[in-house]
Each structure stands twice: as structure tokens, then as C-alpha cells.
């Protein structure tokens, strides 16, 4: 694995710099920008009302936040709304500019805290993939600001299981991750990551499967979805080097979040401080986060047994957030659970 990565990094170093032109993502559900912060735009998908806000903490890993609002019948935002959650917001993380290269995990947690305060000081928090780890850290740091917590496909206890991603993180030396940052002059360029991480497969059958499309693969509807997915997948975002190295070392190599050695905004956090309702949603065939790496949170948080819900669905990682069947059935159930908290 290390020798293969070394060859890939050498190939990247010898190649051309990634194109810095940003293509504006397309959103499916009408929204407005409610807040502009250094790390994000806060997008409001609110239908009005006085209900408690639900904040979707999108992944900050490789792709933009339109993962949460991909297409009709493939939108997490729309699924939450249709199930009765009126005030839905999404963290639309910015692609890292050169000026953002020193942004850290704390930089993002600080902006997340500003958002929660803006939403009234207490919110439902839905953490998706890497955003789930951030959401859990935030919930442990500010437990009184969380009404209900949902973690979906989120890495919590890396040593509780094994996935393709965690195998890579454990096998690659820290110097390899640092070299990737150096190639981007202090940032990790999304185009570089895309060349190194070739998941999921982009064959039509694989995309059709993760989207859980009922139509035949040859229909115009399926063809449009395939094109939309490829456009989204080949539009990666850049990451701050400091943040990227902290995630690689602290969360994956050191497993600090699960072992009580993770510091957030000035002090160590303890996951047992998370004592409210929590829903853990895992994918059976997840190549990014093994179900055990997420479901281990059940024994780490301080919530009472009756407040903890878990579910494992038969899909891949992206199928958790983009799959039509999962959104229609599982996420509508989660939304009703949140509304009843």
C-alpha cells in the first residue's frame, strides 16, 4: 500500500497543477443563504414555523454539500421536509482557498457553534459521513445545545471495525499525508484526492445501484441521474492542510474521539456527556465507514438506553444519503423520530 501511494504521489507531483476554476454546485430544493461564515455558507431550506431547527452537518471530505440535496427523490433535505421537519438548514462548507490552508478542526467547530447560536441556541443535529464525527464532537463539547442527534455513516470508533478507508489511513505513514498537503501548497487539492481514492466505481450499474433507481438503467431518467452523479463526483472540493492532517492523525490513526483524547475548542471532550436522544444509521455494505465503527458510539455516549436508536440498512455508503429507497423509508422514519424527541 505504501509503495503504491508513493508512486501515485510521485505521479501527481510530476503532473500539472489542478484547475482552480470552481463550478457552482446546483441545488435541488429552493433555499437561501442565511449566514456567511469563513468556513461555510449556511443554507436555509425553511418552510417557516416555530419548530426547532434541524441542522444537517454535511461531510467535509472530498465533495460539496449538494450530497444532501442531490436530485428529486434523492434529496436528504427533501426527505426530512416531507416527513414533517419544517426548519432545515445545511452547512455548505467552502472549498478551501489558499487563505484557508491553516483552518483546523476547531475552526469548523467554532463556526458550527455560531450557526447553532444563530438558530436559537439549541438544534437537532444530523451528522452525515465525516460531518457526523464533527457533529458528535460538537455535541460532546456543547451537550446542552443539542435537542436530538443523528449520526449517519459517521466514523466514531475506528478500531471497532475495518473499512477500506480506515485500512488506508492506518497503512499510510503520516509523511504520506504531509506530502499530499505539500503538493497543494498547504491545502489538499480535491483533484489529487480524487485520483488517489477511486471509490465508488463510476460504471453505470454501480451508480444505478447506489442511487437505488427503480427505472431501467437505459431510460432517459436514469441517464440524467448518471450524468448528474458523474458531474457531482468529478467536482471535488479542496481541504485545508491543517484540518486534513488532524483528521488523518487524530480521528483515524490515534482514534482520539473514541478514547477520550480529543480536544475541541480548548478542552478535552468526553462522549459520555452526550446524554440526549441519538439515532445511529449505518450501511451494511459501507466501504468508507464499517457499521461497527459507527455503532460503537452506542457504548460511548451517556444517553439512556431508551434514547438510543440504531439501524443498519442494506446499501453502500453513498446509498445512505442518495438512495431513493433509503431516503423514502429510513430517513422519513428518522425525521418523525426527531420531531417526537
Sequence positions of predicted segments:
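Short beta-strand/loop motif that positions the catalytic acidic residue
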Residues: 274, 280-282, 286
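Gly/Ala-rich beta-loop-alpha elbow adjacent to hydrolase catalytic centers
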Residues: 126-135
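Short beta-strand immediately N-terminal to the catalytic nucleophile in serine-hydrolase-like folds
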Residues: 125-127, 152, 281
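Alpha/beta-hydrolase-fold enzymes
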Residues: 1-4, 120-121, 134-242
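Conserved alpha/beta-hydrolase "acid-adjacent" motif
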Residues: 287-293
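Short, surface-exposed "cap/lid" segments of acyl-processing enzymes
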Residues: 20, 27-97
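Catalytic histidine-centered segment of alpha/beta-hydrolase-like enzymes
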Residues: 288, 310, 314-329
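Alpha/beta-hydrolase active-site loop
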Residues: 100-118
Amino acid at each position: 500500500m505504501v509503495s503504491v501511494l508513493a508512486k501515485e504521489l510521485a505521479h501527481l507531483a510530476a503532473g500539472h497543477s489542478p484547475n482552480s476554476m470552481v463550478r457552482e454546485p446546483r441545488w435541488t430544493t429552493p433555499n437561501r443563504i442565511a449566514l456567511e461564515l469563513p468556513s461555510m455558507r449556511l443554507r436555509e431550506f425553511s418552510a417557516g414555523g416555530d419548530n426547532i431547527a434541524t441542522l444537517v452537518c454535511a461531510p467535509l471530505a472530498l465533495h460539496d454539500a449538494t450530497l444532501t440535496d442531490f436530485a428529486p427523490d434523492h434529496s436528504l433535505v427533501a426527505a426530512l421536509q416531507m416527513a414533517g421537519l419544517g426548519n432545515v438548514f445545511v452547512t455548505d462548507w467552502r472549498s478551501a482557498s489558499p487563505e484557508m490552508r491553516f483552518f483546523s478542526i476547531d475552526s469548523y467547530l467554532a463556526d458550527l457553534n455560531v450557526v447553532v447560536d444563530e438558530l436559537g441556541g439549541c438544534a437537532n443535529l444530523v451528522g452525515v459521513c465525516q460531518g457526523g464525527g464533527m457533529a458528535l464532537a460538537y455535541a460532546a463539547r456543547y451537550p446542552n445545545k443539542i435537542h436530538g442527534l443523528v449520526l449517519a455513516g459517521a466514523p466514531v470508533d475506528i478500531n471497532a471495525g475495518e473499512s477500506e478507508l480506515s485500512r488506508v489511513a492506518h497503512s499510510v505513514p503520516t509523511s504520506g499525508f504531509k506530502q499530499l498537503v505539500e503538493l497543494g501548497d498547504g491545502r489538499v487539492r480535491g483533484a489529487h484526492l480524487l485520483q488517489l481514492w477511486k471509490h465508488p466505481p463510476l460504471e453505470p450499474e454501480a451508480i444505478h445501484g447506489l442511487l437505488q433507481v427503480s427505472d431501467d438503467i437505459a431510460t432517459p431518467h436514469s441517464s440524467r441521474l448518471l450524468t448528474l452523479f458523474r458531474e457531482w463526483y468529478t467536482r471535488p472540493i479542496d481541504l485545508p492542510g491543517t484540518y486534513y492532517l488532524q483528521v488523518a492523525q487524530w480521528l483515524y490513526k490515534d482514534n482520539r474521539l473514541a478514547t477520550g483524547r480529543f480536544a475541541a475548542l480548548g478542552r478535552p471532550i468526553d462522549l459520555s456527556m452526550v446524554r440526549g436522544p441519538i439515532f445511529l444509521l449505518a450501511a451494511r455494505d459501507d466501504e468508507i465507514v464499517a457499521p461497527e465503527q459507527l455503532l460503537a458510539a452506542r457504548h460511548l455516549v451517556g444517553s439512556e438506553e431508551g434514547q438510543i436508536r440504531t439501524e443498519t440498512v442494506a446499501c453502500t455508503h453513498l446509498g445512505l444519503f442518495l438512495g431513493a429507497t433509503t431516503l423514502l423509508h429510513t430517513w422519513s422514519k428518522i425525521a418523525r423520530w426527531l420531531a417526537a424527541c
